[in-house]
């Protein structure tokens, strides 16, 4: 999301909350296993790994797209533009469909997963930020502390999870990934990923990726080019993270 005018204000309001939460919630360590190239023109809004490839949704008005990417080289193998004036957001795959949210238009798009050819559209209330899935449901963030649970066939909401950290609602939940029975969520305008217990909605640990943030002078727009993007290769237990217009994707290994 571009949100430049008020991003610094939100960050100022959010940091005290996270600092309070950090007093009682552990921060989990990690090591960087490997880095991969990432398109510095890609304003990453959604990311997932499937069958050896990354799938990415990029934002910005008139520049939004969905794409299939070769992990090792960063090469874009397939790409479909999101129609203007829609601002592309989170994506997820369900069987032969690629499902994409848009930011404020209350409209989503469904593509053929194999060809990225547009199939149909769907609607929802509020904003669309991110999508992920488990074996039976989709999960959607909308910038609030609530993660919606969607029926993957109808794309209608069937439940929700209120996310709390240290007893307080945790707003600005952004990119999501389902990892080993937990929800991982980027917290917009921070360098933290929240590990969330989906049964209780409680944040059980933070992953602070501050050390991975590129130097400001290497980013085209440091206030907006923030941490966002989580993908998981379940078969090989590989976790990938990146940010908007970052030059690298990081494969990280979480500590015990």
Question: Where do the model's predicted regions map?
Answer:
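A short helix->beta-strand "capping" segment at the edge of beta-propeller domains
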Residues: 23-40, 71-75
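Hydrophobic, well-structured mid-protein blocks that either form specific transmembrane helices
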Residues: 108-166
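Beta-rich, blade/repeat-based domains predominating
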Residues: 40-51, 84-95, 124-136, 141, ...
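A short beta-strand motif characteristic of beta-propeller blades
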Residues: 32-37, 75-81, 117-122, 159-168, ...
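Short loop/turn segments that connect beta-strands within beta-propeller blades
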Residues: 70-74, 112-116, 152-155, 197-201, ...
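Conserved beta-strand positions in repeat-built beta-propeller and related beta-rich domains
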Residues: 56-60, 98-105, 140-144, 185-189, ...
